[in-house]
């Protein structure tokens, strides 16, 4: 797809566990999951892409995509043009934009440009009007935390309490605290809570039952998890899903 002669090429595929590694494209890309959930790492920021969000990546932007469950993967590749966005965007996807993405992802690779124009114009209009999303997690870059971060990204461990993390990396609690405040703008406890929240959203998008999410994230009970989620989002998990058109999750 990096060698486009014009127009848009789409990819639609069902993918399981996948780590793309950091890479770049010579063309613009839109990433979207019709079902399931992806995370995308851009610089030292991690963004969540459930079915209610899409990421616009201009040509040349290094990124890494991780899928920990089954994802209905959609990717659109665009020939760089002045009228297309030149900066990274993570946007909310309404029902119309969702259907436009699906149509473009499924059309033939040899579809004539003239037959793409109306759909592409509607796509650009909807993308320009889509609200920006802000749920993200800044990552520390200190080398002492590198191996620990990789284990977390792979889902092998959860972010532990501060004293246990300090023991793991051979640093003091205060040193770890300073690293997180300097490199993420958050104290470690706030960072850990933000990580748990985004991981909960990811699991909800993958249709994991609330009881299993509560256990996986080491909450003392389902009600403790629901209270935590509501405290941070203002909504219960199921109300959050309903508000975003992701209400297929079991309770």
Give the residues covered by each predicted segment.
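Short acidic-glycine-tyrosine-enriched beta hairpin
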Residues: 44-59
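Basic, amphipathic alpha-helical hairpins
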Residues: 104-112, 126-134, 148-161, 180, ...
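Ligand-binding loop in jelly-roll beta-barrel domains
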Residues: 60-88
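Amphipathic alpha-helical segments enriched in hydrophobic/aromatic residues interleaved with Lys/Arg
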Residues: 83-153
């Amino acid at each position: 797809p990096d060698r486009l002669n014009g127009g848009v090429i789409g990819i639609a595929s069902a993918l399981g566990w996948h780590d793309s590694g950091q890479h770049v494209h010579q063309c613009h890309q839109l990433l979207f999951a019709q079902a399931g959930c992806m995370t995308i790492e851009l610089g030292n920021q991690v963004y969540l892409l459930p079915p209610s969000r899409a990421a616009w990546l201009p040509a040349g932007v290094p990124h890494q995509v991780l899928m920990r469950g089954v994802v209905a993967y959609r990717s659109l590749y665009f020939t760089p043009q002045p009228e297309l966005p030149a900066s990274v965007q993570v946007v909310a996807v309404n029902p119309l934009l969702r259907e436009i993405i699906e149509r473009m992802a499924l059309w033939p690779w040899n579809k004539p440009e003239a037959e793409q124009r109306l759909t592409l114009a509607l796509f650009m209009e909807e993308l320009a009007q889509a609200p920006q999303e802000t749920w993200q997690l800044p990552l520390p870059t200190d080398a002492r935390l590198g191996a620990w971060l990789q284990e977390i990204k792979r889902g092998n461990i959860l972010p532990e309490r501060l004293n246990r993390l300090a023991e793991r990396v051979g640093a003091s609690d205060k040193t770890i605290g300073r690293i997180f405040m300097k490199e993420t703008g958050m104290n470690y406890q706030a960072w850990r809570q933000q990580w748990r929240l985004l991981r909960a959203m990811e699991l909800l998008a993958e249709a994991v039952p609330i009881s299993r999410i509560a256990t996986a994230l080491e909450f003392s009970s389902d009600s403790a998890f629901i209270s935590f989620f509501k405290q941070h989002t203002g909504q219960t998990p199921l109300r959050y899903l309903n508000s975003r058109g992701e209400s297929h999750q079991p309770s």
